[in-house]
Amino acid sequence: MWQQLMVTVDEDLAEDVSDALMDAGALSVSFLDAGDQPLFEPPPGTTPVWAQTRVVGLFEEGGDLAAIRSALGGRFGDERLRDWSEEALADQVWERTWLEHFRPMRFGSRLWVCPTGFTVEDTDAVVMSLDPGLAFGTGTHPTTALCLEWLDAADLQGASVLDYGCGSGILGIAAALLGAAGVHAVDIDPQALAATVENARKNRVGDRIEVASPGGLADFDSDIALANILANPLMELADALRSRVRPGGRIVLSGILAEQADAVASVYARKGFEMEPAVFREGWVRLAGVRRT
């Protein structure tokens, strides 16, 4: 068993409370959004905090959480520490726990993402085997799902594909399974590149997927460029992504909040893309367009 101690603080106090919990014997401390404030693009090298941050400390069973609460109240002032709560956590076999929540998922008419230990009965299905790991991307997030559905509906036979910000490699691997002749998977995170290589091998498309950091990307033109990252990087990368799409080729963008869609679409329209109507889901957006100039 474990114990979890949680408290809500203003953002300027979050780091200090985190340090105090660690000093009090916490095994780990994490931050959660205590309100409803999206925070998707913290500066590199910083820990994301919110205007109202929920600080969560994990302790071994038997710790005196009441004494810790009292000590923090005396140090920071009870009025600055709000909504205290405690919770007992049972030991879990985490592999079994995620399997209870991560089931085969279908995207479009034929593409499935299936974790280890499950099968898909549909004989016409295109099945990707993928388990949760270190890198982002299992298909559960709306932005990933929107991109997978686009791929399922596209004609990818013989296509050259760029997966920029590949994470787990899910989009590039899906493209290869759906018929793409070659995929360039790019990410700034070495763990993401390693995950992509392993997942591509597991799905027997490793010979069609090349991984690289942005600086090591080979010179090529793609028929389709996919970028499921965030709005600000997408706008900053517009020239770089355009240069990787052949005239007449297509671009697919996601990781964009609904209120950011017009700004991102305008940037790419100015770069010579004919943008299609946005597709919305749960506050997120997928944009797609064709390079005309």
From Swiss-Prot:
It comes from the Bacteria. Its EC number is 2.1.1.-. It is an enzyme of class 2 (transferase). Keywords: Cytoplasm, Methyltransferase, S-adenosyl-L-methionine, Transferase. GO terms for cellular component: cytosol. It catalyses: L-lysyl-[protein] + 3 S-adenosyl-L-methionine = N(6),N(6),N(6)-trimethyl-L-lysyl-[protein] + 3 S-adenosyl-L-homocysteine + 3 H(+). Its main location: cytoplasm. SUPFAM superfamilies: S-adenosyl-L-methionine-dependent methyltransferases (SSF53335). GO terms for biological process: methylation. One of its GO terms (molecular function) is protein-lysine N-methyltransferase activity. The keyword S-adenosyl-L-methionine applies. InterPro entries: Ribosomal_L11_MeTrfase_PrmA, Ribosomal_PrmA_MeTrfase, SAM-dependent_MTases_sf. The keyword S-adenosyl-L-methionine applies. S-adenosyl-L-methionine binds at residues 144, 165, 187, 228. It is found in: Cytoplasm. Belongs to the methyltransferase superfamily. PrmA family. PANTHER family: ELECTRON TRANSFER FLAVOPROTEIN BETA SUBUNIT LYSINE METHYLTRANSFERASE. Methylates ribosomal protein L11. This is Ribosomal protein L11 methyltransferase. The gene is prmA.
